[in-house]
Every structure is written in structure tokens, then in C-alpha cells.
A protein has these predicted regions:
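Intrinsically disordered, low-complexity regulatory regions
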Residues: 1-72
Length: 72
């Protein structure tokens, strides 16, 4: 299933192949939002040949805006 590939996708995002240390609540919240964005991208990719997944595209906009708000 899709959830089984999420770990590989997540680790591929980070240059050293490992998730950075979570030192503050803000770090945890940003990582959570990054995972949310990745999940929406994954769902869209799985539906790509059928024209995409509109709800996931919309949710991605929302999660990305939230991530921007938390970015220093």
C-alpha cells in the first residue's frame, strides 16, 4: 500500500537520508506538515493518469500555506 512507501519517500527528501532531530514543538509541527504535504503529493501521483486528485491538490495548498507560516 501507499503507506508502506511513505518512509522511503520521506527519507529521500533529506540530504543525509535521515530525518533531522526534533528539538522543539515547532520542529515537530513542521515535520508533520511536511509529511502531510508528501501524503497529498503521493495521492495525487497515484491518480495522475486519471487526471489527478482535486481534493489532494487543494489540501496541498492549505498544508503548504501552513508550512510557510511556520517557516522562519
Amino acid at each position: 500500500g501507499k503507506y508502506q512507501k511513505m518512509g522511503t519517500l520521506l527519507l529521500a527528501l533529506f540530504p543525509d537520508g535521515g530525518i533531522p532531530a526534533i528539538r522543539e514543538e515547532r520542529d515537530a509541527a513542521r515535520l508533520n506538515l511536511l509529511i502531510d504535504c508528501l501524503g497529498k503529493l503521493q495521492r495525487y501521483a497515484y491518480a495522475f493518469e486519471r487526471g489527478g486528485h482535486k481534493d489532494s491538490a487543494h489540501d496541498l495548498i492549505v498544508y503548504a500555506a501552513m508550512l510557510e507560516e511556520m517557516t522562519l
